[in-house]
């Protein structure tokens, strides 16, 4: 049985594990991250620890899916007025991971971040920053449970949901929940980034 609870009930280490294992070979991270998988995993784990801290401090923060005693999925959300997190705090939290990534990956990461901020939806919305399920729990309904909670929050607030995805398979998945493509960008090494919006019910 899978239980969905607030993200603030999950440990930072577990959140970082789920996000990193889920996205290790995802197109977005292959585009911007270090080449070697082990190096990329270490960088991503540190980045996702910082992401969890940002979510707790400035985010909604989102939801955690637990199966047994194990965290198997996370959804990280922000109100539109809270995104992006304030500077220099946000960059200082990211700095150790950028240093560890090396100069070229750090530059790619900064360029990708700038692209996402430039293209970000600028009207009131709920931002779904991350939706991740650990690999062995994927295609078992965990993502659906998390996304349904996020959709309920947005509908209660009367706001649309905005997200980005660099994974082609995610585009039809999100369409199944009422999202439509509103634009498309390119990451530094050419991977496409889809921008999607779900109107509130």
How would you describe each model-predicted region?
Residues 3-21, 25-29:
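A short beta-loop-alpha structural element at the N-terminal edge
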Residues 36-61:
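Active-site rim helix/loop that mediates acceptor-substrate recognition in acyltransferases
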Residues 57-75:
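Conserved beta-hairpin
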Residues 71-132, 138, 187-188:
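Conserved acyl-donor/pantetheine-binding loop and adjacent beta-alpha core of acyl/acetyltransferases
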Residues 124-126, 154-166:
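Conserved GNAT acetyl-CoA-binding A-motif
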Residues 129-138, 162-171, 188-189, 199-200:
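Conserved beta-strand-loop-alpha-helix junction that forms the acyl-donor binding cleft
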Residues 133, 139-152:
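Conserved acetyl-CoA-binding loop-helix of GNAT-fold acetyltransferases
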Residues 144, 156-157, 167-184, 188-189:
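Conserved active-site alpha-helix within GNAT-family acetyltransferase domains
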